[in-house]
Design a protein with these regions (language model features):
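Glycine-rich phosphate-binding active-site loops on the catalytic face of alpha/beta enzymes
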Residues: 56-59, 105-121, 258-274, 480-493, ...
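N-terminal amphipathic alpha-helix/helix-capping segment at the start of soluble metabolic enzymes
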Residues: 1-31, 147-153, 289-336, 540
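Short, acidic/polar
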Residues: 38-49, 93-98, 249-253, 335-341, ...
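Conserved, mostly hydrophobic/aromatic
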Residues: 29, 90, 159, 202, ...
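A structural motif
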Residues: 52-57, 105, 154, 197, ...
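Catalytic alpha/beta core domains of metabolic enzymes, predominantly
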Residues: 126-143, 148, 170-320, 396-398, ...
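Active-site beta->alpha loop and helix N-cap motifs at the rims of alpha/beta catalytic domains
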Residues: 2, 55-187, 318, 327-339, ...
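Extended, intrinsically disordered, low-complexity segments
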Residues: 282-335, 362-389, 395-399, 504-531, ...
């Protein structure tokens, strides 16, 4: 694994209809319908919309035998109209449904957490090694006949592990850990290898981006150790909608794509399925610009653990580094110094002139040659100003520096100036590689100066900035290297959008919270209420509750499991019915949909977590 130079992980090719995946094939884009699978016309129409938007695979839920059998009609309707897109059946709880679906679609997704094991109940189960082996034999006895059906019908499979639906068996032995998620997958993969079944795709997903990235990294390493090269499907489950959904997806998926992991992606947005496709396409196209880049001669620090990174040890300089949360630096060189109270930067880079009226609680950065030592202001130097920096008496100094400027002179200077915060810059096609290389060099030299990452863009659309900046920052955050973020955009976007994006990235990476976090699924044929309007109502009532995590889930597949990561949850329980959760405990069942949002607010209030919105 080269941390500094991009190359795609070598994978085996998997045949999925006329659109193979893995090997030398491009990274495929996909989405999932949210129409009822027994409604042939609606499913075919939505599948066409996904394909017309650029989708290369279409997934449909099949919760029962009738739905699985109707996949034949949906497939036929699409083929009749000239749409040859491979269809994927999404199966939970009932392996018999997978057997049926495998006869009518090009790929079947099964969930190891509920394929043979009973649905998750959060009970701790004790197994002897012999009893555990017997459970694995049960999986083999049920799984092998399914593989034989797939062989007969040239059907591929996806072994799709979800953090929210691990079995009690796995949870009891491994805990709620990346190791448990990986083993849940490997149990099935080893059977595939033993049965010489190779048309297999793997996915391990979570709404928690830290868990998702760490687990996929570990899965790739474990597969490599066991000589497996199956392609990877990437996604952040329950990413949400709007700005949050895009940032969260780009952060998690982008971090893995940037390291060459991933052969197909789905951006799971709580929006129309076809809206996911352009976002996914932009993300893949942006990462693909890393290909064939000039070589970066970085050297990995000896004490860095890619599979289980911890935050880099730094010495705090005022409120930057050490145990402090990552800071946000914003620029205001155009003289427009207004800020959003919810997303007020910690520092504003003003360039060569301070504003006439300063924002309360904000500190300012000025170019060193015009800095005059005013209270609440700090000087910024470039790497060619080392003598000036050395003689400056400020207790906080910013040094803007690209990786290739890290000379012996610079290193020697930094060893005598712990008050310097480094602002890492890069114009390299693979800026992640250079940012990483700079920090790893600091680590090798034993330097503990905090590092803020400067990311430069020229975007006119908020979505483009959100996708690119989140993708660029993802691995840096998950590697534990980030003491701050400085987004500098020279397009037409407002400062408010840029600031909100920076704070959104830190929240999506779970290193700094600035607002309510919503964990919401994209919906599928199992969802029996209007998910998008429900999300809007829940957000309107709770978006001011900074720090709370609220889950809004369409059904019970991942709903209860994902509630373990949420403070409160709203989970579909049947047509027009909702259950409410506090963490993973179901508090009230089968509430009429029209009353559920009000009941959710009552639950939050009853537990002392609600404050009135005074804005």
């Amino acid at each position: 694994m080269d941390l500094f130079n991009y190359s795609r992980r070598e994978t085996s090719e998997v045949n999925i209809g006329a659109s193979p995946m893995g090997g030398s094939n491009p990274i495929r884009i996909q989405s999932m319908t949210n129409t009822a699978t027994q409604d042939t016309e609606a499913c075919a129409a939505q599948a066409k919309q996904i394909v017309d938007a650029g989708g290369e695979y279409v997934r449909l839920t099949a919760q029962g035998i009738k739905e699985a059998e109707n996949l034949m009609n949906i497939n036929a309707a699409l083929r009749q109209d000239g749409y040859m897109v491979p269809l994927v059946a999404d199966i939970h709880f009932n392996p018999k449904v997978a057997d049926v679906a495998a006869q009518y679609v090009e790929k079947v997704r099964i969930n190891p957490g509920n394929y043979v094991d009973a649905a998750r109940t959060f009970k701790h189960l004790e197994y002897t090694d012999e009893e555990y082996a017997q459970e694995l034999q049960k999986i083999r006895d049920r799984f092998v006949p399914f593989l034989n059906i797939c062989k007969e019908n040239y059907t591929a499979i996806r072994i799709g592990v979800n953090h929210g639906s691990l079995s009690d068996r796995i949870m009891s032995r491994y805990g709620d850990t990346p190791e448990g998620m990986v083993e849940s997958c490997m149990e099935f993969l080893r059977i595939c290898v033993e049965e010489n079944f190779t048309d297999v795709v793997i996915s391990i997903k979570a709404s928690n981006t830290v868990v998702m990235v760490k687990t996929v990294r570990l899965l790739a390493a474990v597969m490599e150790k066991e000589g497996m090269h199956f392609p990877l499907h990437l996604g952040v489950t329950e990413a949400g909608d709007g700005e949050d959904g895009r940032i969260k997806s780009a952060l998690g998926i982008g971090a893995l794509l940037s390291d060459g992991l991933g052969d197909t992606i789905r951006v799971s947005l709580s929006e129309a399925p076809e809206a996911e496709i352009p976002v996914a396409r932009k993300l893949v196209d942006y990462i693909m610009q890393h290909q064939n880049h000039p070589y970066i001669p970085g050297v990995e620090a000896e004490d860095f653990n890619y599979l289980s990174p911890s935050r880099r040890e730094t010495a705090a300089v005022r409120n930057i580094g050490g145990e402090h949360l990552p800071v946000v630096i914003a620029e205001r060189m155009d003289g427009k110094f207004e800020t959003n109270p919810q997303f007020t930067p910690d520092y504003i880079y003003a360039g060569r002139a301070l504003p006439e009226v300063r924002e309360q609680g904000v500190e300012y950065i000025l170019d060193a040659d015009v800095w005059q030592g005013e209270v609440g202001t700090y000087p910024a130097f470039n790497y060619e100003q080392l003598p000036l920096m050395g003689s400056c008496q400020a207790d906080l100094k910013f040094l803007f520096m690209p990786y290739m400027a890290q000379t012996e002179e610079v290193i020697a200077c930094l060893k005598h100036h712990p008050e310097v915060v480094i602002v890492s810059q890069s114009n390299h096609p693979n800026r992640l590689g250079e940012h990483r290389a700079l920090v790893h060099q600091l680590m090798k030299e034993g330097l503990k100066n905090p590092v803020v990452f400067f990311q430069h863009y020229m975007e006119n659309e908020a979505e483009d900035l959100q996708i690119k900046s989140a993708a660029d920052m993802g691995a840096l955050i998950f590697d534990g290297l980030c003491d701050g973020i400085f987004l500098f955009n020279q397009g037409s976007l407002s400062h408010a959008v840029v600031d909100a994006t920076a704070f959104g990235i830190l929240q999506a990476g779970r290193v700094r919270t600035s607002k309510t976090e919503f964990i919401s699924c994209p919906g599928c044929g199992r969802t029996l209420f209007d998910l998008q309007s429900t999300i809007a109502r829940v957000k309107a009532a709770t978006s001011h509750l900074k720090g709370l995590k609220i889950g809004i889930m369409g059904c019970i597949v991942n709903g209860p499991g994902e509630m373990a990561d949420a403070d409160y949850g709203y989970v579909g329980a049947g047509r027009g019915k909702v259950s409410l959760y506090k963490k993973k405990e179901c508090i009230e069942k089968n509430i009429p949909e029209e009353e559920a949002v009000e009941k959710l607010i009552e639950l939050i209030k009853a537990n002392g977590d609600y404050t009135e919105n005074n804005l």
